[in-house]
Amino acid sequence: MAIDEDKQKAISLAIKQIDKVFGKGALVRLGDKQVEKIDSISTGSLGLDLALGIGGVPKGRIIEIYGPESSGKTTLSLHIIAECQKNGGVCAFIDAEHALDVHYAKRLGVDTENLLVSQPDTGEQALEILETITRSGGIDLVVVDSVAALTPKAEIDGDMGDQHVGLQARLMSHALRKITGVLHKMNTTLIFINQIRMKIGMMGYGSPETTTGGNALKFYASVRIDIRRIASLKQNEQHIGNRAKAKVVKNKVAPPFREAEFDIMFGEGISKEGEIIDYGVKLDIVDKSGAWLSYQDKKLGQGRENAKALLKEDKALADEITLKIKESIGSNEEIMPLPDEPLEEME
């Protein structure tokens, strides 16, 4: 539809004035601006990368990862840090819980020598540090662990029985209002790890669970990932890890509500080899005959754990099968449901 000439002149004049005050590009016609592809950082999980629709978590956005205790929230975040560092990214970890296991992070592939770490005393200090490093323009990824541990200074300085209703929620709301635009401008990804609480007096319909820190994070987050432990993995009667399910409950850059399941092995983190086998079997790329698993003419092993061990040693073969899985799923990256259980028994 053609725009009136007088209106065109008025708009052009306004754009020139805005550019003069706020800088060139402060207001543009969408048709004149090239739509940029959304870059992403891999999560370290093949299934979750596909579920997110763009190959990982989006750059320049706020991400929330939440779930019950020991569900894999910090493990997933450390894998994202490792993947970002592999591509030359600079990462920071704001450890509000004062519980970062450096040795575990190193085993997951994190370059701990170059990881920036802060253990702040208060929520205000944590968020000030977050804002400062983000505005520097030199950081690619920041992880805050966790929202629940961002305790306001007034609460720390007060007596044990004092009530501080809504203090943390107001702190988060204020910080997110300040930081969102800067994150986009600097192309910095911010991940908040969050915990689950039960709603007091919840009756009737709806989930009785909620996350800490108020509602602001729910609105500002471009992606929200709910991660849960769904089973224990056993080998020779020994617990060797957990099976986790991650659900993308909010996604502003691709269709939401997709799910992914993966193994989290004790001391090793997310098992990429386990996902390769699961997706390979589902898509008929990996053949399963009884307990034996094979790819083309090559036997991978008898049983899932043996096949995982072989793929862990043969990276080239693992990469080849991964590529075939991605090609089979297609350019739309429609996530295909996995079997309800992995290929060996769990409890």
UniProtKB/Swiss-Prot annotation:
InterPro entries in UniProt: AAA+_ATPase, DNA_recomb/repair_RecA, DNA_recomb/repair_RecA_CS, P-loop_NTPase, RecA-like_C, RecA-like_N, RecA_ATP-bd, RecA_C_sf
Impact when changing D319N: In strain: ATCC 53726
Organism field: Helicobacter pylori (strain ATCC 700392 / 26695)
UniProt subcellular location: Cytoplasm
UniProt-listed Pfam families: RecA (PF00154), RecA_C (PF21096)
GO molecular function: ATP binding; ATP hydrolysis activity; ATP-dependent DNA damage sensor activity; damaged DNA binding; single-stranded DNA binding
Effect of S40A: In strain: 69A and ATCC 53726
GO CC terms, sorted: cytoplasm
Residues that bind ATP: G67, P68, E69, S70, S71, G72, K73, T74
Matching HAMAP family: RecA
Protein name, as recorded: Protein RecA
